Design a protein with these regions (language model features):
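Residue-level detector of conserved catalytic or cofactor/ligand-binding positions
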Residues: 225-234
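A short glycine-rich beta-alpha junction/loop motif
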Residues: 64, 212-224
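DPxDG-like acidic metal-binding loop motif
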Residues: 159-199, 204, 214
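N-terminal capping segment at the start of a domain
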Residues: 39-47
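Glycine-rich flavin
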Residues: 58-66, 71-169
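Intrinsic disorder at enzyme termini
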Residues: 2-28
Length: 234
């Protein structure tokens, strides 16, 4: 995909994302924790399915969207609950009692709305204008990715491990080492925000007890992306 346009990407949300926009602004700590507790029986009933599928079941993903658990740290300006980091610990502890993989995905994917808030406004809009419920995976193994500056942005390539929740996600934040020249030493770290059409998911995750995290590798060949699709480490 070398030479691909760095213009704003038009994308279609996954079928599992809610069609209607819902605001969770004003939902407080206690209410969000109670929402997690009410989901425990359903998640417990699907725990074996989650491990068998090696990803979140669609029904579980929909339940988590409806409850707002993926949006606990999303900025309030786009309808997120905008709660502090303590809610991650308590919500995930409740869910982990019955399905550690689901708990892992909640904490992991919910934190990426917070991370997206550090990208330029036009990049936030590229995702949240289409769906405020968008799911974003990550792999923060910076040495796994390589990048260099090109006109208008960066050229990025690599193979990244442990991209939890990648099958349920439409986007991915992938770490890379920035080099001034192809064979030069790293000079900085960056995140690249890529749509799932821009990388390959490699089906190699079979960890006993945490198969449902779906922490597969992802890879892309030389890919040019716009400057607004990259940022320094949060």
């Amino acid at each position: 995909m070398k030479g691909q346009s760095t213009a704003r990407l038009e994308w279609t949300p996954s079928a599992t994302l809610p069609k209607a926009r819902t605001s969770f602004a004003g939902v407080g700590y206690d209410e969000m924790l109670e929402r997690a507790r009410r989901l425990v029986p359903k998640i417990a009933a699907r725990a074996e399915e989650c491990e068998r599928l090696r990803r979140l079941p669609d029904e579980t993903e929909r339940d988590l969207h409806e409850a707002g658990l993926f949006r606990i740290a999303q900025p309030a300006r786009v309808g997120g609950a905008d709660l502090d980091v303590g809610i991650f610990v308590d919500v995930c502890a409740e869910i982990a009692r019955v399905c550690p993989s689901t708990a892992w995905n909640i904490g992991n994917l919910a934190s990426h709305h917070w991370m997206l808030g550090y990208f330029p406004p036009e990049t936030q809009d590229e995702l949240w204008d289409v769906s405020t419920d968008v799911l974003i995976a990550t792999s923060l193994a910076f040495p796994a990715g390589r990048g260099r500056k090109v006109e208008g942005g960066y050229e990025v390539s690599g193979r990244w491990p442990l991209s939890s929740g990648v099958d349920n996600s439409d986007w991915n934040m992938l770490g890379f080492m920035l080099r001034e020249h192809e064979d030069g030493p790293p000079v900085d770290h960056r995140f690249a925000l890529l749509h799932r059409s821009q990388y390959e998911i490699i089906d190699n995750w079979h960890a006993v007890g945490l198969c449902g995290t779906g922490s597969k590798d992802v890879a892309t060949k030389a890919m040019e992306i716009g400057r607004a699709s990259c940022r320094e480490r949060v």
